[in-house]
């Protein structure tokens, strides 16, 4: 069913924008005739969706006005850099490098447990890190990864610097990864997972006939929160970018939340798109 909906979405996205305008005008008139909740109330309900789409902790491509090219999320960049650096470290010292990652993270966290618990947590953290990095990076790491050799201070520091992206990624935990460091007593969902859950829960509580408007409000809120690039030149309308943003928002929320949203989701504000300052020519 999910593949079928995405296929229909892709088919409708390839049609001309004028075709969307027809459904937009009809949808807007129908929307005005209905007893709909207030704009502010809808936007407040969809705040988690705004937060999730802005964080982009999943590989979403949201071409809002300032986004001229596809951008990776910060977590994706951290993951890529982590795997890239880990691949460059010789196999015989990868265990040592991973130990350094564990040490670096534990040193940044408050030491509230006794030494025995810290050692137990460190061993468990090490095992989880091995499994995570092996699955995430698809790079060989010995199964029985033990710190077998002593390295000089300069080599220690160099290894730690190389795997800084790994520490950053694991601390962000934007993927469903749970590394039980000392202060973490139970497996906890990531911040992105929490926001995603809240987003889907709120979207499911909105009546079907109002979901299009709610998603449009999300796209508008994100656009208004983002800085507008101003260069010297002429004003140009940003209707294509706005419609593409809404289309991508629809696709992302359909896939993520598995909630019914009309395939032909009308854009009630399509005929009242403000002229956004986009300059062409001249110096910025």
From Swiss-Prot:
InterPro entries: Bifun_inhib/LTP/seed_sf, Bifunc_inhib/LTP/seed_store, Glia_glutenin. It comes from Triticum aestivum. Residues 1-18 form the signal peptide. Seed storage protein. Might be integrated via inter-chain disulfide bonds within the glutenin polymer. Belongs to the prolamin family. Contains disulfide bonds. Pfam families: Gliadin. One of its GO terms (molecular function) is nutrient reservoir activity. Keywords: Disulfide bond, Seed storage protein, Signal, Storage protein. PANTHER family: AVENIN-LIKE B5, PROLAMIN PPROL 14P. SUPFAM superfamilies: Bifunctional inhibitor/lipid-transfer protein/seed storage 2S albumin. This is Avenin-like b11. SMART domains: AAI.
